[in-house]
Amino acid sequence: STDTMPAANTNAEFTLMCFGERLDFSVYDQSCFTILYFGTSFSQAALFNTAMELLTEIQQITAGMHLLLNASFSGKGLQYLVDTASRIFGNPIYVVDLQNKYLAISAGIVPDNDFFREESKSGYISKQGIASIRANHLDEMVRKYNHPYYYTSELVHTGMLVDAIHIQNIEVGHVMLLESEHPFEDYVPDFFH
């Protein structure tokens, strides 16, 4: 609460999250610590709950990154990496090369969709899928943003993140994370990239 603010000359580095009536914070301009002020609409419980949600999210990202890093250097190949990533995200992942051949399809989580079942059997993106990619300029959008592109497929009626795969700055394929089992959290696009 702003009722219990420390002295401005407190000689310690920390971040203080506070709520309550607004003060003249200019007296803290030269302080060693940082103040995050949330206004009067926040309560102590709301501030605590928000902080816990953010810390939990950070912990999940850190744990997921650790698992992905281990999978990357495990020597077990692309399929193992894709399966590990799929377990972390809780959604299916597909990797294709630039000739529309599936290089890896995550095991375990399979969307209940005839289109994906047929494509998985053939090992290639179907003509219908290629036509949709071209009509929606999906390849161009992925290259333009240099970041995962969110796309809702009219063929599977669900969203997906699509990102380019580069090896030594050369695009060699695309990776797709389907939003079929769990909705994407705000951090997913950055983590997926």
Can you say where each PLM-predicted feature lies in the sequence?
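Alpha-helical/coil-rich non-catalytic "connector" segments in signaling and regulatory proteins
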Residues: 1-193
